[in-house]
Design a protein with these regions (language model features):
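Short helix-onset patch at the extreme N-terminus, typifying the N->h transition
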Residues: 7-9, 35
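Bacterial N-terminal signal peptides
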Residues: 10-20
Length: 154
């Protein structure tokens, strides 16, 4: 009788361990792909309107690449940003002398924190999947109202 109790307890512990390892090994691939901005559904809060924009996210084995390309209303140039970070090991990527970028997963929300070294300003971008399958991006910058950008999968 005592032997069967040990097997039951051991089995329960191993099962719990298996589920714990599976949860921590989870890759966040739902946001992977190229997304196109839907300006009419986005809220710019009085900031310069983005005419066109794409975001490409690739999360694989803890390495995350976020590429962003935007063209602002009235501007002749297209702005391109690309961050490659290692969220699994909490790496911080220094992009040139002026920018430090860090990504992390907060449950199913991808958070990209950009710190501008000279000013110390911090911009936080939060990427999440909306209930209708769109990607919602919330951008919080110092001294600005938060903006919400809506993207559709390309």
């Amino acid at each position: 009788m005592r032997t069967s109790s040990i097997y039951i307890i051991t089995g329960a512990v191993l099962t719990a361990l298996l589920f714990t390892v599976s949860a921590f090994g989870h890759e966040h691939t739902a946001l992977n792909g190229t997304w196109t901005l839907v300006p009419a559904q986005s809220n710019f809060e009085g900031q310069p309107v983005i005419q066109t924009g794409t975001v490409t996210i690739n999360e694989r084995a803890g390495d995350i690449t976020v590429s962003r390309s935007f063209k602002y209303e009235g501007a002749n140039d297209t702005f391109f940003y690309r961050d490659l970070t290692d969220s699994q090991n909490s790496a911080t990527i220094h992009t040139g002398k002026d920018l430090k970028t860090k990504t992390r997963w907060d449950h199913d929300v991808l958070k990209v924190t950009n710190t501008y070294k000279q000013s110390g300003d911090v911009t936080i971008e939060s990427y999440s999947l909306g209930p209708d399958g769109t990607m919602l991006v919330s951008v919080m910058r110092p001294d600005h109202k938060p903006i919400t950008l809506v993207f559709e999968r390309k």
